[in-house]
UniProtKB/Swiss-Prot annotation:
GO terms for molecular function: RNA binding; structural molecule activity. Residues 437-469, 517-549 are annotated as: Disordered. Its main location: virion. The keyword Ribonucleoprotein applies. It is found in: Virion; Host cytoplasm. Keywords: Capsid protein, Helical capsid protein, Host cytoplasm, Phosphoprotein, Ribonucleoprotein, RNA-binding, Viral nucleoprotein, Virion. Pfam families: Paramyxo_ncap. Homomultimer; forms the nucleocapsid. Binds to the viral genomic RNA. N0 interacts with the phosphoprotein (via N-terminus); this interaction allows P to chaperon N0 to avoid N polymerization before encapsidation. Interacts (via N-terminus) as N-RNA template with the phosphoprotein (via C-terminus); this interaction positions the polymerase on the template. The lineage of its organism: Viruses, Riboviria, Orthornavirae, Negarnaviricota, Haploviricotina. The modification Phosphoserine is found at S439. This is Nucleoprotein. Belongs to the paramyxoviruses nucleocapsid family.
Length: 549
């Protein structure tokens, strides 16, 4: 029997590795599009700044073809290079397009009409067509310029430092657009705005040279549609990773942004490794995890075997990225997500409620994390030289803090199927903060009376900022999943007209409060005995701040 199990383990591992081709093998050649890339052989800052604006206009032009935008993007990312001719050779490695270099001496005064070098393979009709494309901006671009400030294009640029500041400000916006171009391109641009603010604070991005949001979106769309550009950017990212501490500004900037791009599309895999294997807690010994642990082992070997480009599987559209999908290890993924929601507040920004998420193992992860937060790693404790008394003190400290934040109080399981912003938020984070007041628009008819006989509000689950708590289970399938682990959830009243408190806006909800009989909604009484009546004219101030960043 042991030989069969060993054979199964080898089979699982080899199944992930056997379909890889030899490194550097050339794929069968397909039809290639001709891409014209412009090269400037002089360091003239005026000419390069005009080329920067010309490329931005070609990318944003409403009638430009895909090959025009690809050539403009490669030219744009090559402008800081002292030798553009050599730098563009990075794009020659792509099997997707045929790169044609066109050497440019400059532009005709006051226009975007190219002045080609004698060696450039450009006809008069192509030069005229490029000039028309540069002036053909869509109506969604305001003031006839891609920049927010209309006078930026016409400003003189006669110093190398001026050109580099403007060029880096534009390129850093283009690189930020690369971060989400393959994984969440249609999501709100909150993360991009935060990164822009970061680089402005660092002095890498000058606010005066900000592009319009529509221009940024068009750049992101062009990058998303072009595998040639993304392969070129991958080579740039690899060059930036190899740089030492003494590097130029451009590759230091690319290396910084590369941290946001690396391993995109592999978040589920790395979170599973972090919260399931990294914690090394006892549920890993469950027999149900045995096969999936072998799967994770084979995936780790596959990732190491892919080499340096494994970090950019999503950017390269590599088919191997499908091997890392969490659908291949759903049970241990569910367990890891349960652990992560308790340990890491940033997990609330990650959509882990997949169709294959198992509610039982998610709750096992939640309960394990809550109970094991105070455990001590004996090996680390031995390295630190902790005595048994010190280890006990650390455990008691964590347990005491966890109890103060409401851990372990019954009130229902964490519901992974409800988005975090819709789940009920804690009434009080610490014991010295009073409970929140009832909503002003609750519509109760009890005249604002408190709980009967002066009773306090019934105890409900209160969690810290890492705690995602459930709403009453309406779905019978979900109720079936969670009921065995939390039988007390059936005691929570299930009314259709729940009274909801608002915290800082419409999307924040407080816990529901009921009287001691659980049959009607009454006024909430704070932990210090103060009653919050249902009076629309009385607005007590909450002491709990927003839960969103």
């Amino acid at each position: 029997m042991s030989s069969v199990l060993k054979a199964f383990e080898r089979f699982t591992i080899e199944q992930e590795l056997q379909d890889r081709g030899e490194e550097g093998s050339i794929p069968p050649e397909t039809l290639k599009s001709a891409v014209k890339v412009f090269v400037i052989n002089t360091p003239n800052p005026t000419t390069r700044y005009q080329m920067l604006n010309f490329c931005l206009r070609i990318i944003c032009s409403q009638n430009a073809r895909a090959s025009h935008r690809v050539g403009a993007l490669i030219t744009l990312f090559s402008l800081p290079s002292a030798g553009m001719q050599n730098h563009i050779r990075l794009a020659d490695r792509s099997p997707e397009a045929q790169i044609e270099r066109c050497e440019i001496d400059g532009f005709e005064p006051g226009t975007y009409r190219l002045i080609p070098n004698a060696r450039a393979n450009l006809t008069a009709n192509e030069i005229a067509a490029y000039a028309l494309l540069a002036d053909d901006l869509p109506p969604t671009i305001n003031n006839g310029t891609p920049y927010v400030h209309a006078d930026v294009e016409g400003q003189p640029c006669d110093e190398i430092e001026q050109f580099l500041d403007r060029c880096y400000s534009v390129l850093i916006q283009a690189w930020v657009m690369v971060c989400k171009c393959m994984t969440a391109y249609d999501q709100p641009a909150g993360s991009a705005d935060r990164r822009f603010a970061k680089y402005q604070q660092q002095g890498r991005l000058e606010a005066r040279y900000m592009l319009q949001p529509e221009a940024q979106r068009l750049i992101q769309t062009a990058i998303r549609k072009s595998l040639v550009v993304r392969q070129y950017l991958t080579f740039e990212l690899q060059l930036a990773r190899r740089q030492g501490l003494l590097s130029n500004r451009y590759y230091a900037m690319v290396g910084d942004i590369g941290k946001y791009i690396e391993n995109s599309g592999l978040t589920a895999f790395f979170l599973t490794l972090k919260y399931a294997l990294g914690t090394k807690w006892s549920p890993l010994s469950l027999a149900a995890f045995t096969g999936e642990l072998t799967k994770l082992r084979s995936l780790m070997m596959l990732y190491r075997g892919l080499g340096e480009q494994a970090r950019y599987l999503a950017l390269l559209e590599a088919p191997q990225i499908m091997d890392f999908a969490p659908g291949g290890y759903p049970l241990i993924f569910s367990y890891a997500m349960g652990v992560g929601t308790v340990l890491d507040v940033q997990m609330r920004n990650y959509t882990y409620a997949r169709p294959f998420l198992n509610g039982y193992y998610f709750q096992i992860g939640v309960e394990t994390a809550r109970r094991q937060q105070g455990t001590v790693d004996n090996r680390v404790a031995d390295d630190l030289g902790l005595t048994p008394e010190q280890r006990t003190e650390v455990t008691q400290l964590v347990d005491r803090l966890a109890r103060g934040r409401g851990a372990g109080i019954p009130g229902g399981p964490v519901n992974p199927f409800v988005p975090p912003v819709q789940q009920q938020q804690p009434a009080a984070v610490y014991e010295d903060i009073p409970a929140l007041e009832e909503s002003d628009d609750d519509g109760d008819e009890d005249g604002g009376a408190g709980f009967q006989h002066g009773a306090q509000a019934p105890a409900v689950r209160q969690g810290g900022q890492n705690d995602f708590r459930a709403q009453p289970l309406q779905d019978p399938i979900q109720a079936q999943l969670f009921m065995p682990l939390y039988p007390q959830v059936s005691n929570i009243p299930n009314h259709q007209n729940h009274q909801i408190n608002r915290i800082g806006g419409m999307e924040h909800q407080d816990l529901l409060r009921y009287n001691e009989n659980g049959d009607s909604q009454q006024d909430a009484r704070g932990e210090h005995g103060n009653t919050f009546p249902n009076n629309p004219n009385q607005n007590a101030q909450s002491q709990v701040g927003d839960w969103d960043e």
